[in-house]
Amino acid sequence: GKKNFLHDLRTELKAKTGTEPPFLANDPNIGGRFSMFSPVGMFTAELMGLDSDAMIKAAADVFEDFKAAQSIQESEAAKIAALDILLTQKGLQNRYSMVYADSFEALNKFRAQLKGESLNKTGVASTIQVPGVGTANHHSDLELLFKKDNKLVLEQIYWGKPAQDHVNSKSLDCLDDLVGQSNHQSLIDNHIIALGKYLIDNKAVVIQTIIPEQNEKYLSQ
């Protein structure tokens, strides 16, 4: 098989010290994008404070539901793939993914890689996911999206229930209309929905990907 530097390092350390260093064994049948759910990805997840068992179970549940489905309508994964293929058939080649939480930025780029390694890799005519520039520069996203006939599909990605939120308390009189408002709900009402409606009114296609809750289950699925 392929040379593995870490394997060679472990072997040499054992030979020279008489002690085998601790290691995580990886199933040789797991590679590529599927490595996310092997020790390659899950060790990092644990270091971040995530429950790897919960993430693996959530991903397995999605796969089992897909295998058990008798039709596209019975599988969420199949419906998402079918929609993606349909968009391409309608002449919409690029899906621009705009995230509304910093915690999504790295994940959004990873999703683009997963997309390229699945439908796109097998030659299926499906959209190309273009990760947005991120929350710190949404005005650049808007400059691109507001162009007429840009053939872009806007995907808005946000938490349904973030792990942390803030409800505005009484402060300055000029801010009284914000008292009692959740920052997250304000973001949804005043930016996400408003932008989506504007683009739809201008004949653009908008998809909302709402992750119900900020936890391992929904993050993995």
Language-model-detected regions and their locations in the chain:
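Active-site phosphate/pyrophosphate-binding segments
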Residues: K2-L154
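Short, intrinsically disordered, charge-balanced linker/junction segments flanking boundaries
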Residues: N215-Q221
